[in-house]
UniProtKB/Swiss-Prot annotation:
Residues 1-40 are annotated as: Transcriptional activation. One of its GO terms (biological process) is negative regulation of viral transcription. It is found in: Nucleus. Residues 319-351, 360-372 have a biased composition (Polar residues). This is Upstream-binding protein 1. Residues 60-296 form the Grh/CP2 DB domain.
Amino acid sequence: MAWVLSMDEVIESGLVHDFDSSLSGIGQELGAGAYSMSDVLALPIFKQEDSSLSLEDEAKHPPFQYVMCAATSPAVKLHDETLTYLNQGQSYEIRMLDNRKMGDMPELSGKLVKSIIRVVFHDRRLQYTEHQQLEGWKWNRPGDRLLDLDIPMSVGIIDTRTNPSQLNAVEFLWDPAKRTSAFIQVHCISTEFTPRKHGGEKGVPFRIQVDTFKQNENGEYTDHLHSASCQIKVFKPKGADRKQKNDREKMEKRTAHEKEKYQPSYDTTILTEMRLEPIIEDAVEHEQKKSSKRTLPADYGDSLAKRGSCSPWPDTPTAYVNNSPSPAPTFTSSQPSTCSVPDSNSSSPNHQGDGAAQASGEQIQPSATTQETQQWLLKNRFSSYTRLFSNFSGADLLKLTKEDLVQICGAADGIRLYNSLKSRSVRPRLTIYVCQEQPSSTALQGQPQAAGSGGESGGGTPSVYHAIYLEEMVASEVARKLASVFNIPFHQINQVYRQGPTGIHILVSDQMVQNFQDETCFLFSTVKAENNDGIHIILK
């Protein structure tokens, strides 16, 4: 036994000696100074890489930083964007911090900057339909705003403004050299934009976005400096506290290995800076939004689902100018249509332009190309949906059901688009049937020619009646429709009379039109006015 052990020791020592000998010569052929790490790092390729990295680090240094005093959720995975829960209507502080290095942006020294804080949608699909979503919210909650600024609690902000047409944005001026805090209140909750199906649906995430601008040569705050945003969800009062507590309890039940996959909860939320790049828009939408600045983050490809993106900021020169209402439609002799062409940006479901578009017979055909479909959407005041339907032909659009359109466009515009596609006209308030007698040169004081009996005129020719549909029960509407149907110059019509008992002429007033019976038949004749300036119309 002892002999066997001694043999093992001899063999082992021999193997170790051979192994050491085989390694002892490695690298000696190259020489001691042949491989120097300092020489390798001094190569030009590494010098260029170091310089590019330093430039990139310098470019990434943001001029400002915004910190919201609200805790982040502990139930967020490591490589995902932070998520913060907010209570509806509660004031939350956003600290506006100057993050510039010494000598950076000297043009801002002693100057004010303008920041616009907005609550926008996180999901890209909802961002494209933001206008329709917010209009629906406004319809359900008239007089309310999605975002407010708690001015008494805010510090260092100047010239605060809100625009009645932009319920999700507030703006103010501030001095980067001074302490500044803006307290915001979010009044919309995440579940308000979730389709109601069976209850218990998860609310959609929002983003709190801050865009900062400096003055241009004209003194207007239009030069963009910085944008940052964070992801939030808004709950009913105290709902955010309960959600935060539930997430914390769930994390406590996880194992230590599982906890390593999640971020810790931080007391504050840092708004993440986004590098912005413009989207190249098609020609149709470019005409519709010449001044829009829709943007995407530079790392759009892989991280869009995780990090979201900054939403396009509103046009600062005109965003807070009160636009005067458009003038009422006017009618002239050169305008044979029954009403004026509506503004393409109007989205009111009760706009008078619906009747005009359908009365003219301009409806989309199944053979319409994608470009013709885009033009039809613009003409019928669906310009907000040109991007959504950019690849739709006429046949594709006509195949959509009413439920499909409501889901895509929302209830109001979805029903309006469905009715436009099906060419459904608005039911008139009053319908009258009118037949024209041969023009008479008889003066107003003379008696007009009596109508023939049995539905025929005095010459024995069968009388052909035209239907007149009145959307407005006023005398001017009667004159306007008669001029349009019978090709009478509207500016030549002085008065409209109705022949009463014993042949007297009664002036047609708004009150008389309102007392017309539906589907009343009239014969009418035209007579020259007393001064031969224009004509009068007499209904019989």
